[in-house]
From Swiss-Prot:
Domain TBDR beta-barrel: 190-753
Entry protein name: Probable TonB-dependent siderophore receptor PiuA
Disulfide bridge map: C420-C430
GO molecular function term, any single one: siderophore uptake transmembrane transporter activity
Family stated for the protein in its record: Belongs to the TonB-dependent receptor family.
Membrane-topology descriptor: Multi-pass membrane protein
UniProt-annotated location(s): Cell outer membrane
Short name of any one Pfam family annotated for the protein: TonB_dep_Rec_b-barrel
UniProt function note: Involved in the initial step of iron uptake by binding iron chelating siderophores, thereby allowing extraction of iron from the environment. Probably involved in the transport of siderophores, including host catecholamines such as dopamine.
Alphabetical UniProt keywords: Cell outer membrane, Disulfide bond, Ion transport, Iron, Iron transport, Membrane, Porin, Receptor, Signal, TonB box, Transmembrane, Transmembrane beta strand, Transport
GO biological process, one term: siderophore transport
Source organism: Pseudomonas aeruginosa (strain ATCC 15692 / DSM 22644 / CIP 104116 / JCM 14847 / LMG 12228 / 1C / PRS 101 / PAO1)
Phenotype caused by lack of the gene: Deletion decreases sensitivity to siderophore-beta-lactam drug conjugates; phenotype is complemented by ectopic expression of PiuA or PirA, or by heterologous expression of probable siderophore receptor PirA from A.baumannii. In a pvdF and pchA double mutant background, in iron restricted culture, growth inhibited by 60% in the presence of dopamine and delayed in the presence of other catecholamines such as epinephrine; growth is inhibited further, but not completely abolished, when pirA is also deleted.
Amino acid sequence: MSRQSTDTAVSSQRLLASAIGVAITAIAAPQAAQADEAGQKKTDKDRVLSLDAATIVGEQQDETTYNVDRSASKKYTAPLLDTPKTVTVIPQQVIKDTGALTLADALRTTPGITFGAGEGGNPAGDRPFIRGFNAESDTFLDGMRDVASQTREVFNVEQIEVSKGPGSAYTGAGSTGGSLNLISKTAKQDNFTDAGFTWGSDQTRRTTLDVNRMIGDNAAFRLNLMKHDAHVAGRDEVSVSRWGVAPTVTFGFDTPTRATLSYYHLSTDDMPDYGLPLTNVNRSKANPSKPASVDRDNFYGLKDRDYRKSTTDSGTFRIEHDLNDNLTLSNSTRLVRTTLDYIVSNPDDSRGNVANGYVYRSAKSRNSTSKGWVNQTDLKANFETGFIKHTLVTGLEFSYEDVHNRPYAITSGGGAGNTCNARLLASGDCTSLNRPTPGDNWTGSITDGLAYTDTDTKTSAAYVFDTLKLSEQWELNLGLRYDDFDTKSSGYQTAGRNGPAGYFKRENNSHFWNYQTGLVYKPAPNGSIYLAWSTSSNPTGETGGEGQADISVGNNGLDPERNRNLELGTKWAFFDDALSLNAALFRTDKTNARVASPDVSTLQVLDGEQRVQGVELGFNGKLTEKWKVFGGYTYLDSEIRKSTVKSDEGNKMPQTAQNNFTLWTTYDLLQNFTIGGGTTYVDKQYGNTANSTYIPSYWRYDAMASYKVSKNVDLQLNVQNLTDKRYFDQVYSTHMAHVAPGRTALLGVNFHF
């Protein structure tokens, strides 16, 4: 059984903390003497940001901006103002100002994203739903699919791009509601050191170090380090611990050939939390189940049994060469290995004990290793055909992923059964609903399980994108992609929904085309109106690498689900491009959704239809030189239009908030003093297609104040969930709802040299 050594973990954490301290001391001493010069240099250059992460060296961009005007992905062949698609870029400054410490924290600054709960696979924070559709397998890193199940941090993230609507022409399999593109920090043409120390409520301690050094005139090295430990506000016994390191080196600044080599490591060691049980086991649409009315801090896990540990190691090499002024060839290769190991208590698991004042601790586990690689080649060209100007990108993409999972065999110490009684209470398998005891002496056993699954997924793809400038007012944006998606699943299964116990082997091979087209009209240089059409495909086994179920006997022979999107929108830039506003009307249809067969319960058929239509508004940038805003609003009208379960027809889609509003704003009261605040509204969400489980709507408020002590030192105070609101941010289809953290105060001290 691969439970990691606690002593080893502690030693690694102490080693990292010591390394950060030594590095800060060593670097700060000589830098202090050059503080004035470095501070002036930083002001003059505005700290160059490598925006085009798929391109080794990008355009310079103000790092303090709330408004980014161009995507980092090569596949977007026009500025965002002229891109016929809703794309929200969460810049570094928004991540800093909001005090975001996780990917989920950062994503809450943009509307139209909710988070799903699940029994296994990825940590729930890495399971976003975009415009009502699951996007957990639609996360990209620097324009390449981030293969393998993993936990993601923000210490090495420069910005986050959220693309809305079906986009398989850009991404391949998935991206029905949209996709995420995380842009990592790379070496810059500058010398600087940033060190941050954060102390907070609930024993929060976070240390970060970001060092960039030029190596001669045309190369640079950058190192990011992070150590984070905290308990979770409002939740007994729940804690998180993680550390990470990310070195990167770039060669060839200001030359025709440029290359970057990067490495990333993240280790986590958490006490997992599945939240509170749902109440009504005899639930229905007319009588839906909601979270139990108990104290928010009630924790139903076992602190001496439950754990979750993960590691991520990835290495990336990117190179590009300018063949001439209008033609650039680039290639990127990434190798990834991740591990995910946990045992967690699912509160009650729909066993009906809640009505009697008890909770059954249903143990869930995973012990997986994922390995994979991605290779992507792009050719970017600028040329003219007659009066038409083209910006074209064409490329090839190949990827491979192997996931091995052998869950643990967990045996109750109280014998068979899951209805709470004196025997199961004594063994620690059950606890009180109102006064749970996470310190119970659990008397069961944990061994390596007999069942295991190996899932291999291979993808080969070719694509082309072109922005055709027909005139000063008209542009045509086109994209086309072909995918060969092959996934195989084999292993040993115990008796259950996939048949009798024994060895199995299943395979699904899918070939699909996807496209997008958009017509852009520019009534003025600072504005655009567009009409766009796009498609996406969801093949069987798409989420296998992200911790979800392997290919089953019920779906291994099915064709991909197909999705299409029609969007009418407009984008405008004001105040010399300091402020961006956008609005869009859209309709996304899934025309052949996988649903249960009406004839054989273990099989699925492509006989469902789903629709999400609505409106999205967005704003980001400066209203004045002192006042910044970032946020938006979405209205999502979701509907299950057709299903083999007739009672589901007309219902709302799960994990879809009809109304979602986000606002973050800051104001410079003085030259060195800034205040800020934010609010988020998320509407009611259902946990399943039957609409028989739900979590209620909520408002959340946040606040911030920062003070520049000098050009080298600043302070920042964040208070998240200012009113200590008790709310739920994830709901599962049958069992539980995740409790969001309570009020959290964070005080950061940051040094810049």
